[in-house]
Design a protein with these regions (language model features):
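Short aromatic/hydrophobic "clamp" motif used to bind/position activated sugar donors
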Residues: 85
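A conserved acidic beta->alpha catalytic loop
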Residues: 38-46
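Glycine-rich, basic loop-to-helix element that forms the pyrophosphate-binding segment
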Residues: 62-80
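Acidic donor-binding loop at a coil-to-helix junction in glycosyltransferase catalytic cores
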Residues: 167-175
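A recurrent flexible, glycine/aromatic-enriched loop bordering the glycosyltransferase active site
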Residues: 119-121, 134-152
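Non-catalytic, C-terminal membrane-associated alpha-helical segments of glycosyltransferases
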Residues: 200-247
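Short, well-formed alpha-helical segments that are part of the catalytic scaffolds
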Residues: 12-26
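Conserved donor NDP-sugar-binding/catalytic core segment of glycosyltransferases
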Residues: 93, 97-125
């Protein structure tokens, strides 16, 4: 088996069909499988996954880790057979040539490749967020790899101990990869769409969570503050401080 695609979902019946259809198209030329982890779903997510014929369907009815998404990723990894592991979130749509472009980049000490994630400008708020994402290009911090559409060598995941119980398992993964003197590559010319319809509540909660995750990963307050200022996300710094006060 060459590629195992891990997709984790919690009540994503609005988006998961489009996601799985795009993954199937992208895998058409490859020996691959879809490992689908349905995390305590109470909607039609599981039925839709069955409709699209995922190769391994794991219905997760428990939560033993503090961070359930990280737990789902680890469960998916333990049930994967591929040489390469691809993490594709349930609200992401990938292009047909996704793996054809991503796999050749894995050479030398490059063991992980992440694509550019852009918000689909389908609603007014989505269009605002799509425009805001362009601030990555003018800030001094640049853009870090994201886990929403990634390919990584399975043997490297095994070497670093898989996924850990943290709020931001993708960033945590990149940190541990670098500590092993490997490279995690971000490519802005391979684009995937984030198709979720954004709400103001999701934006606010996302900033709080991002700040808390930065604290948990050992990122300094000054860097979190700089991110808040340059990226116009003031609640990230507040989320960092709130998590710091808890400890």
């Amino acid at each position: 088996m060459l590629i195992s695609v891990i997709t984790c979902a919690h009540n994503e019946d609005k988006y998961v069909g489009k996601c799985l259809a795009s993954i199937r198209r992208a895998l058409r030329k490859f020996d691959g499988e879809i490992v689908f982890v349905a995390d305590r779903c109470t909607d039609n997510t599981v039925k839709i996954a069955e409709k699209y014929g995922v190769d391994k369907l794991i219905e997760k009815t428990w939560r033993r880790w503090k961070n359930s998404y990280a737990e789902s990723l680890q469960i998916g990894l333990l049930n994967s057979s591929g040489k390469y592991i691809s993490i594709i979130d349930a609200d992401i749509v990938v292009p047909e040539n996704f793996f054809e472009k991503m796999l050749p980049l894995m050479r030398g000490n490059i063991v992980s490749v992440s694509a550019k994630v852009e918000t689909l400008p389908s609603t007014l708020l989505n269009r605002v967020l799509y425009a805001w994402e362009k601030t990555h290009e003018i800030t001094p911090f640049g853009r870090e790899p994201r886990g929403a559409a990634r390919v990584i060598k399975k043997k490297i995941l095994s070497e670093i101990g898989g996924f850990r119980d943290v709020m931001a398992p993708d960033t945590d993964l990149d940190i541990r990869v670098r500590r092993k003197n490997y490279r995690s590559l971000y490519v802005d010319w391979i684009r995937v769409w984030h198709i979720r319809e954004i709400t103001l509540r999701k934006i606010i909660n996302g900033q709080f969570s991002s700040g808390a995750a930065r604290y948990q990963l050992g990122i300094s307050f000054m860097r979190a503050l700089g991110h808040s200022i340059f990226r116009l996300r003031p609640l990230v710094a507040y989320g960092w401080l709130r998590e710091w006060l808890k400890h």
